[in-house]
Structure formats: C-alpha cells, structure tokens
Amino acid sequence: MNKAVIISLLALSLFSCEKKANVYTLHSGNTSLTVTNYGARVMSIVTPDKYGIMENIVAGHKTVEEYVHPVGERFLGACVGPVANRIGGAAFEVDGEVYHTPINDNGHNTLHGGFKGVDNLIWDVVSVCDTAIVLHLLHPDGLEGYPGNLEMTMTYTLTSAGEFRIDYLATTDKATPVNFSNHPFFCLRGEGNGSVEDYLMQINASHYIPIDAESIPTGEIAPVDGTPFDFREPHLIGERIGMEDQQLINARGYDHNWCIDKTTDGVEFVCHVSDPVSGRFVEVLSDQPGLQFYSGNFFDGHEKGSNGNPLGFRSSIALETQKWPDAVNHPDFTPVILKPGEQYTHTCIYRFGVSEE
C-alpha cells in the first residue's frame, strides 16, 4: 500500500465491535484530502488561497480519538445516514409497519440516523490509491430501528480538475428509507478564521422548506421570492441573516433545505460560495434534489480545530446535498424509500478554486 497515502494507523473499540480506524491522505494537483474510515470522515482539505498559501479549509481534528469523543459538533466532516437530516417524531411507516428511531434531537426527533448512525461506525476500506478511496459498510437490519440489511459503498475521489467527488451506492433486502449526505464544514479562510457572514453565496433554488421551532419541516414548499432565502443571485450570507424572520429565528440563522431547480436527473449546479479575503471558492454540484445549508449557528468556540483555533460562532458552513428532510413522513416530498432490487445512488462534487478578482 502506498506510503504516501496511509499516514497513520490505530485501533479502536467501538460499540462492542473492534475494527481498525485508519487515516488516509489523497493528493491531486495542489489539493490534498485527509479522511478516516471512522464515520467516513473528512479530516482536512488543503487548497491554496489567492496568494498561493496552502491551508486546510474544513473544520476538523488532528486525531481520530477527538471524533470518537467530541467536545462539540458530533458530525464534523462525517458521512451521515442512513437517513440524513431529521425524522420528525423519531418514527416513520413503511409498508404499513411503524418503525421507531432514536430520539437524539430536541427531545422528540431523530437527527442524522441516531446515536449509532454511519458517522459512528468504522467502515471497511475496499481499495485506496493516491487519488481515491472506496469504503464499504453493512448497516444491519434493526440497528437504531431501521429495517433491512443496508449495504453501502462510498467512493471519495480527488479529480485532476481540483474537485472532491463523492459517489454513494446502497442496496437493501427490505424496504427502508435511505438518504445519505456528507457534513464537511467549510471555512474558506482556514479553521476558526473570519466569519461566514462575509461569504458570497448563490443557490440554484426557487423554493425552500420552512421548519418549525424544532427544525422539522412544516410540509410547505415555499417560494424564496421576497424572503431572506432568495440566493438565486449572489448575496452575502450576513446580509439578511439577522432579519426578524420567523424561519431565521427558528434555526438561529440558516439551517434549511433548498429545493434545487433541477432540469435533469443528472449532476447539476447547486451552489457557489466564495470568500473575498482568501479568494477561495467552493462550488457544489449534485444529482440530488436538495441542499441543506447550515451557517454554523451553534458553534461557540468551545471546540478547537486541527490548527488549535477555536471554532467560533458562524466560522464555518455546511453544504449538504441530499433528498428533502423528513421526506419519509411527507408524501409530497421527494421519495426516500429504497426497495429490494433497487439501487440508491448519489453523486456530490465540491469544486475548489480561486476567484480571479
């Protein structure tokens, strides 16, 4: 195995199942990506700014142990599922049977799969090379209340075009909800540096999904017209985030799903975020119908990044491509039930660069 790829190896005992958690670094051009198979987490993405200075642009930790025993954000850099985002009431129905999932959010709901979601499991490494890693996980029938043995394969690739590409594939032997996403927190000036309120954001969406006080979708698919959620043209994130808008109050800022204006079933433009200070930008492309944009409203500086800087309020953002939240309880939302004989697929591309301005 390539010595430039594997940079450390350690053993963990997690949930009574001993596996090895490895750390890998991939390289392509002037971009490097460090991941661990514990939760299929992104630990760092190093890219140049407009002056050529190389810096990690996602919030992370130096060691796997810090992810196993987090002092703050549990989902930092993780793959989340089997159902990303929230399940209202921690329950859903499939084929006439009601299933109950763990309550780990606001005292009533399930967030990102539960306590033992895929972010808290050690994935098997199928293959690894300088620019790609393939991970596999079996999520057994009944774990955290989800039906079916869910077989998952995920490929992380650094392309020659300076892109971080994620490809998901899943199958099941019993009908079950499936909606994976990834949770890197982007800090385009480096960990703990500056505020995302200064970032310029554009989202390809004419509608978004309003939420209640527990961040559960109300069932409405609302137009962004005339609201602080209209990013069809670029706006500074901080321009309207402090408005007296009930939706912003509910989430303490932005933490909502935008319904992407898709024209095909393939990979299309989702959003573009740029930082005027570093010149860095990240552009997101995906084949999924939704984007959860979270403006880092609950970071408080208690947790530190891999560079030792505190991860403060709104110092990073999450851009999560996915199907719509709580879709399993909303028949009018994009369907999330995977049946035997079907394949769940999902492609997300994070394209990095430096603005010419």
Model-derived features: positions:
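Sec-dependent signal peptide recognition
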Residues: 2-8
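An exposed, glycine/acidic-rich loop-and-rim segment of catalytic or binding clefts
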Residues: 18-357
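Hydrophobic h-region of N-terminal signal peptides that target proteins for export
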Residues: 9-17
